[in-house]
Amino acid sequence: YTHAPFNQPPYTTPGGVAPLFEHHTNSLVFNDPPLHTRVRRLIMGALTRRAIEAMEPGLVQLVDSLLDRIETQGGGDLIEDFASAIPVEIIGNLLDVPHADREPLRGWSLAILGALEPSLTPEQEALGNRSVSEFLAYLRQLVAQRRQHPGDPEHDVLTRLIQGEENGDALSEVELLQNCVFLLNAGHETTTNLIGNALISLQEWPAQRQQLMTDLKAA
C-alpha cells in the first residue's frame, strides 16, 4: 500500500486517504499475517458458540416469516424477498443494531462491495466512499452508546469486541470500526450468493433435490 499508485486518486482525496481505501487497508480480509492473524484471533474470540447459538430461534422465526410472506403474496424474488434479508438481520443481531436502524445496512454493503468491481465507474467509487463514511459515522455512535451502556457480553458480540482482550492485546478503535463494516460485507454477499446458487443447483440436479425433500433434516 506504499507503492506510488496508491498515493494518488482514487485512493486519496484532497482531504487525505479515501474512505474506501482506508477501509480496505484496515479490514481483516485485505491484510496478511501477522496483522491478519492478530485481528482474526481477536474477532473470533468475540464470536462465541453461545452467542451464535442464542441467535438460532430468532433466525428460524425470520426465515419462517419471510417464506410465509412470499406464500401470501403468491410468489416473490428469491434474492430480493428472501436471501438478502437474512444476512442483514444476522449481522444486525450479532452487533445488536436496533431494528429501526437496520434499513440502510444492505445499501451500504452493496455499495462498498460494488466498489470492488474491476471496471469501477466514478459514480460507483463516489457511492462506495460515501457509504463507508456513513456506515462508520453510524458505528461510532453505536460504539459510543455501547461503551456507556454495555450489552450482555455472553450474547452481544459488539460489546465483546469493545471489551475483548487477549494477552493484553485489543482491537484499536480503527480496527474495531472497520472490521464491523467487514463483518456485514462478508456475511451479506456470501450468504445471499449461497442461497441463490443452491437453488440453481437444486433445479439443475433434480435427483439431489428429491433426495433433499425426502430427508430435510439432512440439510
Predicted regions and their residues:
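Cytochrome P450
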Residues: 1-219
